[in-house]
Amino acid sequence: MNADHPIFPYLEWLSGRQPVRTLKGLTSAYLAYPVAERMEQRQVRGKLAELHRHYRKPFAERLRLARQQLADTVAFAMQAVPYYKDTLGSIGFDPERLRTDIGYLQDIPLLTKDIIREQGDRLLSRPLAEAPHFTCKTGGSTGLSCVIEYDQIAADHAAAVVLYCRKMAGKSQRQSELHFACRFPGDPVPPWPSREDFKCFAMNRSNIFFGALDAAGLDEIWATLQRRRPYLVHGHPSTIYALACHIEKTQGKGKAFAVFESSGELMEDYQRKKIAEVLQCRVVNRYGLAELGVMAYDLDGGRGQGMQLLDSEGWSESLATDNAPDGHQELVFTSFRNRLMPLLRYRSGDLGRVEQRENGLFLTDVVGRLHDI
């Protein structure tokens, strides 16, 4: 059976209604997800519990822990990664000083995509054949793409971060989510069931594939959303903004989901306002990149506090650069989780500002990316 069988729209409609909706959510969260986690030899739920414990701590304590983690990460990189062993060893860098003097971090040279491409395996702490790993290629929206290798622990942390952030936005694992993806001409229709289908069931997730944002394409998207009725929708803001404009023109307003999670490109204020008003949903923003995963999120559920930087996942900086317009600063990150390929002071290519407040670090004035279909 192929995934375009005519029975599936009916099954989608059925799974979006009670009591099937609740039964499916409970089965996904408490049966399918643990089974999938065990089959894939992942350890996500334990790391999710760690994140909940971490963010219950006062910010001053979290900041102290982040500084210790920063020093530990740099020390590990100097000991295990050939590139850092040579680069930082040549300047006599002492990572222990970071525990008491965070300004000393400025002595570490910035890491760029060019350096990652040039150095290759010299940025790895061990050969890829020695441990499970996940290869991720950057999209190239902020320069030429490069390859990042994640170890198992880092991949599990990245998955746990997404679950934690969505929980803060009001979405539990029992509630369904929908992801937007492009459909290209000539793409074959996949068979059903597949490994991806079980993965989606375990995560209580479905995908929606679209090829165009014309009136017919937007009508198809809206009809699918009405059938499935997900709690959270994840996609590019430009796509959902186009949908909001179409619904406003044809219906005035409409509601098919509770939360829109913006990702992949910069969401402008006018887009956020239109989406919230027309589609009658809460809008949450997040910032992430292939090199590091999700690094900032509207942890207050999109209620106005802004994107909070995840101090558990890395050290964040914003630095003035000569080529940045209007005094913007470039975002620079040091990753804490990925011991296979630790990135120290990595230049993201994105512009924004790191702002310290009483309750955390926040990402403001972001100038991001735009994706065209």
Residues of each region from the PLM?
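Short, well-ordered, mixed-charge alpha-helical segments that flank or form enzyme active sites
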Residues: D156-A158, F184-P190, A242-L243, E268, ...
